[in-house]
């Protein structure tokens, strides 16, 4: 369980837009939104404040209630030309590490100390920012859906930011584990960012709009 009131990223200071958010055990939150709308910063806010709380440090929220769990994030995957690892291959390696991490947590292996016979399982919270970017759109969607369906069978909760609006259809899954949230923008003569999370699926995108703004100059 994770319940934050007026939570924000510590690096933003006074200009931060604060958000409320609750994560329930065995539930998954698919977050959509335009570029620069606040998805990645929000994911980091959740992770950073959890780590601060577990370290006994002040948190950047009016209120934060948490359960004890293991945290796994995948935010900035990079390729490795030196070792012949492409971006997509690096993503697969990271997702395999995640699966192993979650299994070990569920089996209690991560907490087993030398000489102890008992194992104490621990839940996992995963924070994923736009997985499988290194492949085409359809392959990415199918792969992401298959991965989430598999991970949902384990004692795991997750927050997944994505540009794949089709992935939001997982909310209709019979399990009831998937929930849609978004960061919406307003498009007028310019783009207005609210940075406030809300229920639902993002309706507006800004890539073409902003590109047209650039093209108008030339």
Give the location of each predicted region.
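ATPase nucleotide-binding head domains, primarily ABC-like/P-loop NTPase cores
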Residues: 2-218
């Amino acid at each position: 369980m994770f319940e934050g009131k007026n939570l924000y990223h510590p690096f933003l200071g006074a200009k931060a837009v604060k958000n409320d958010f609750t994560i329930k055990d065995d539930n998954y939150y698919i977050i959509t939104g335009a570029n620069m709308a606040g998805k990645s910063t929000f994911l980091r806010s959740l992770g950073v404040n959890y780590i601060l709380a577990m370290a006994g440090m002040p948190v950047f929220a009016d209120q934060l209630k948490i359960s004890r769990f293991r945290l796994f994030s995948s935010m900035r995957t990079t390729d490795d030309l030196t070792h012949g690892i492409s971006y997509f291959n690096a993503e697969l390696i990271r997702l395999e590490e995640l699966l192993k991490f979650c299994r070990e947590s569920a089996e209690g292996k991560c907490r087993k100390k030398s000489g102890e016979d008992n194992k104490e399982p621990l839940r996992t919270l995963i924070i994923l920012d736009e997985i499988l970017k290194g492949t085409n759109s359809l392959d990415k969607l199918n792969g992401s859906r298959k991965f989430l369906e598999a991970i949902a069978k384990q004692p795991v909760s997750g927050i997944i930011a994505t540009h794949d609006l089709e992935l939001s259809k997982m909310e209709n899954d019979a399990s009831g584990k998937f929930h849609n949230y978004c960061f919406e923008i307003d498009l007028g003569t310019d783009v207005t960012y609210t940075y406030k999370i809300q229920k639902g699926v993002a309706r507006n995108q800004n890539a073409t709009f902003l590109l047209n703004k650039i093209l108008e100059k030339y």
